[in-house]
Design a protein with these regions (language model features):
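Outer membrane beta-barrel strand-and-loop segments of large Gram-negative receptors
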Residues: 12-21, 101, 121-181, 317-319, ...
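Structural signature of Gram-negative outer-membrane beta-barrels, strongest in the C-terminal barrel
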Residues: 13-132, 185, 210
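Residues that define the transmembrane beta-barrel architecture of outer-membrane proteins
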Residues: 18-22, 53-55, 104-108, 128, ...
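Repeated loop/turn-to-beta-strand initiation elements of outer-membrane beta-barrel proteins
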Residues: 35-38, 68-71, 119-122, 178-182, ...
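C-terminal beta-signal and adjacent terminal beta-strands/loops
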Residues: 182, 235-255, 269-275, 280-334
Length: 334
């Protein structure tokens, strides 16, 4: 990996290792009454590196009020190991993270389902998640809860991070009928964490909201032998969070230095993504020909990567990429 000065390379990570991960899951379903359904589950897994068996209980309750309305409640205990290279890295020739515990979380969900018509449904879900034993660095705001890439991780970590996520999801869904369908979803949420700095603050992914709209329409020709279907999706999402940059220190050091005392207090602007898919099907006697055209990111929305120091301009810049991806395909179905 390249160090901060052009032409100078430094070894950041050089480690190797292996382990195993085994899991099993069981579920039972009880119909307590015609309107009350209970699901109970248990997941067990063994992480070879820690030689530890963990049990996770799950429960779900569905209460059907009538043909149109139902309520649901769900709980689950979840846990997962980090990427393997997190445990295998060496600092000063010592594998400093092999004793890290597995991250754990409690998930609670409360839902409401309203069948408005035989073609239209509304759903609302509220949720709360509490996370603990997440790995982070002692005395700083650094935590794997905000990690995007573990490739260059070379820090000694401890299980010092807590997190909490809560929000509400709303869905309006029209099933495919009369040759068209649509799906509209909206989410409002908050995501916070507390690491070694012992302060609750935003996670990187506390975007605040996400809106999605999906629409599809079918057109029939030639006695239904030919079908043209058009599908479009639009997503509007709040921007990712980032920590303020200490500009004078960064320019002097020729690398980005963040203000860890105000971790992830800044936010990038909201983004709008759009995808378009057009399929044209010709039904033959014993087969079908399908021509497809797909365009991802039609509006050319940028993908923000990270802040970096530009050696040519001597400035701190936000790196980004814009990918508009077309795809054309043809297939024959028998």
């Amino acid at each position: 990996a390249q160090d901060y000065v052009p032409g100078i390379y430094a070894r950041i990570v050089n480690s190797a290792g292996n382990t195993n991960f085994t899991e099993a899951y069981g579920q039972v379903k009880y119909q307590l009454s015609p309107s009350l359904l209970v699901n109970l589950g248990l997941r067990a897994h063994h992480f070879g590196l820690r030689k530890e068996i963990m049990l996770e209980n799950r429960a779900g309750l569905l209460w059907t009020l009538n043909n149109q309305h139902s309520l649901s409640f769900g709980y689950g205990k979840h846990s997962q190991p980090e990427d393997l290279n997190v445990y295998m890295i060496e600092v000063g020739g010592v594998a400093v993270n092999k004793d890290l515990k597995i991250s754990e979380a409690h998930h609670f969900v409360l839902g409401y389902d309203w069948q408005l018509t035989d073609k239209l449904r509304f759903k609302a879900e509220g949720y709360f998640q509490y996370l603990w034993n997440i790995a982070g660095e002692e005395g700083t705001s650094y935590s794997l809860i905000n990690l995007r890439r573990a490739l260059y991780l070379n820090k000694k970590l401890v299980n010092n991070t807590e997190g909490r996520n809560y929000g509400i999801d709303l869905t309006l869904e029209r099933f495919l009928a009369d040759n068209y369908y649509y799906l509209i979803t909206g989410s409002v949420f908050t995501s916070k964490y507390k690491a070694g700095h012992n302060v609750w603050c935003n996670t990187r992914y506390n975007k605040g909201f996400v809106l999605n709209a999906l629409f599809g329409k079918e057109f029939y020709f030639a006695n239904n032998r030919k079908v043209l279907d058009v599908n479009a999706r639009v997503t509007i999402t709040g921007g990712e969070r980032y920590s303020p940059i200490l500009e004078s220190q960064s320019l002097a050091a020729k690398r980005v230095i963040f203000d860890e005392s105000r971790a992830f207090s800044e936010q990038l602007r909201p983004l709008t993504y759009a995808d378009l898919t057009v399929n044209y099907r010709i039904n033959h006697r014993k087969s079908s020909s399908v021509f497809s055209f797909q365009m991802k990111n039609v509006l050319g929305a940028p993908i923000y990567i990270d802040h970096n120091y530009n050696y040519q301009t001597g400035q701190i810049e936000l790196s980004k990429a814009t990918l508009v991806i077309p795809n054309i395909s043809y297939k024959i179905e028998f």
